[in-house]
UniProtKB/Swiss-Prot annotation:
Catalyzes the reversible transfer of the terminal phosphate group between ATP and AMP. Plays an important role in cellular energy homeostasis and in adenine nucleotide metabolism. PANTHER family: NUCLEOTIDE KINASE. Belongs to the adenylate kinase family. ATP binds at residues 10-15, 127, 178. This is Adenylate kinase. Monomer. Residues 126-142 are annotated as: LID. Pathway: Purine metabolism; AMP biosynthesis via salvage pathway; AMP from ADP: step 1/1. Its main location: cytoplasm.
Length: 194
């Protein structure tokens, strides 16, 4: 199973990816985790990424695409993977399609978790309150103003992926506002049609 989960910050992509990973035994591939691992391993591409990040710049699509390509080749991805935070742009999606095709692979589905943005802000606020109540650390960008900026960035940069994947016929849209169990069940129905 090769899957992309789309949706704005706070839509529940990480929650769903975690549940699917546990059930199907395939890895969740997070761009941030892959970048950090490449830097820690001091691979050639990791060194290039580190130099860019140390300069306070965004890592180029070329570097991110190469890191993703290398990660997909790892043995634990032989039976599939769930991409989280990649692709973020249409050019990255096009590169992913070419990359997978070159490996003789294709995506099984691109699932978009459709959510109401105002409800997302409330969801974020309650997640912060729960984290604080449990004595946990809160992300510096987990406040309404920063969260709304992340939503705007998502709309501008990542939301066009919906149109792109609708055009390829791979997009499936589900209600991300439903309870977690219902969202999971709907994803399973898409992945394993009756």
């Amino acid at each position: 199973m090769r899957l992309i989960l789309l949706g704005p910050p706070g839509a529940g992509k990480g929650t769903q990816a975690g549940l699917l990973t546990k059930k199907h035994g395939i890895p969740q591939l997070s761009t941030g985790d892959m970048l950090r691992a490449a830097v820690a391993q001091q691979s050639e591409i990791g060194k290039r990424a580190k130099a860019v990040m140390d300069a306070g710049q965004l890592v180029s699509d070329e570097i991110v695409n190469q890191i993703v390509s290398e990660r997909i080749d790892a043995p634990d991805c032989a039976n599939g993977f769930i991409l989280d935070g990649y692709p973020r742009t249409v050019p990255q999606a096009q590169a992913l399609s070419q990359m997978l095709s070159g490996k003789g692979l294709k995506l099984d589905a691109v699932i978009e978790l459709k959510v109401d943005e105002n409800a997302l802000v409330k969801r974020m606020e309650s997640r912060v309150a729960e984290t604080i109540a449990k004595g946990g650390q809160v992300r510096s960008d987990d406040n309404p103003e920063a969260f709304r900026k992340r939503l705007v960035e998502y709309r501008e940069k990542t939301a066009p992926l919906s149109s792109y994947y609708a055009g390829t016929g791979e997009l499936r849209v589900i209600n991300g506002m439903a309870p977690v169990e219902e969202v999971t069940a709907e994803i399973e129905r898409i992945l394993v049609p009756a």
